[in-house]
Amino acid sequence: MFIISETQRTFASFFIFGLLNNILYVIILSAAIDLVGPSTPKAIVLLADIIPSFSFKVAAPFFIHAVPYIIRLWTLVALSATGMVLISLSPTNVISWKILGITLASLSSGLGEVSFLQLTHYYEENSAIGGFSSGTGGAGLFGSFLFMVLTNVMGFPVWVVLLICAVFPSGFIITYFNLLPLPMHEYQVILQQQQEREEEQEEEEYQQQLQDEARSQNIESIREVKYSVNYISKHVQNTIHKITPLILPYMLPLTTVYISEYVINQGISPTLLFPLKEVPRWLISSYRDIYVVYGFLYQLGVFISRSSVTMGIRIKRLYLLSVLQFINVMITLYQSIYDLPFHSIWWLFLLIFYEGLLGGASYVNTFKSVSEQVSRTKREFSMGCVSISDSLGIVTAGCINWWLELKLCHLQVARGRDWCLKGGSL
């Protein structure tokens, strides 16, 4: 009988969590040109796919500790499954329903990322963080590959593929109850009283102030003061105080990398086109297919580099990755405007793959650095906060792309190339 160790079960569980949490996000972005058409900025789908997730992750540090993991799990399953059904079955010409479905799936993704990164705190860090990071990279690879094969190669209707994906979230429940081992130390809902005990030095000052206010105002109990506007204000200030040290070493470099790569992916790559007679026809039969292939190659690079930490590969200079990714933006922007420096799509395939390598390396090395450098008592909170960074970068890129993609397309049309206006739709 084949027996796997707890370490292997931990890695496998978090790999599945990462895979399932990100796969719908990837498939939705892969289907962007089908959902809104070639002449509409793909930034619409990108922003709908990320703003709800980003908003949730910004708000999560203020309340997520009070929600048990099992409730979070069932909530994200319901949100993601409902979202995919809405996207796939809504009428073709009613984009608003598709955007609502994307929004629900995005909320699920944000809840999942915060929750599973916090859950890694209770398991061996290399197995848990490495598994989740590899899983998120695997989601990009598997999701983009699945979508490319089913639509580009096999010719399935996009709405059918999206409807099939609605069953994926059930894997969260199966994995959580049947594969995930018991934690190294017990986790529980962190009520306010427990949070105060863990952060005694910071909270003692606030407790004393609350007691003084209670006595001076003749309030019957400290509990009434704790939930007053003044207490909430102090709690917010305390949370912001704990987030501030994370910004420069971890959050800023990850944010800038994501700005660069999503400007390329959703703003520039829809205009990185070549004559159909010069591309591999077994894989690409329309200009829409080129966009899908770019997405797969990017996700392939992400998967490989996100798995690198499990092989002992570490990059501690996080800002170096930011600089290298920005150079990629400049190269692809020049290519879109002047058709230089590449005269073959194969070189662009290689560049997009390299872009994915940088993005995945930035993600996994950032969270690995947090796990190594932040004290255990603050690590769970820090993981949740740093997870905001990638979403912030994507939101920023989406705002840029709203203008950039149309501008680049208009420049190409002005010089006689209208390929960016051609594609497919759902």
From Swiss-Prot:
Protein's cellular compartments: Vacuole membrane
Keywords: Amino-acid transport, Membrane, Signal, Transmembrane, Transmembrane helix, Transport, Vacuole
Membrane-crossing segments per the record: 44-64, 67-87, 99-119, 129-149, 154-174, 243-263, 290-310, 318-338, 340-360, 384-404
SUPFAM superfamilies named among the record's database cross-references: MFS general substrate transporter
Descriptive protein name: Protein BTN1
Gene name per UniProt: BTN1
Signal peptide: 1-32
Keyword Transmembrane helix set for record: yes
Role: Involved in vacuolar transport and vacuole pH homeostasis. Also required for cytokinesis.
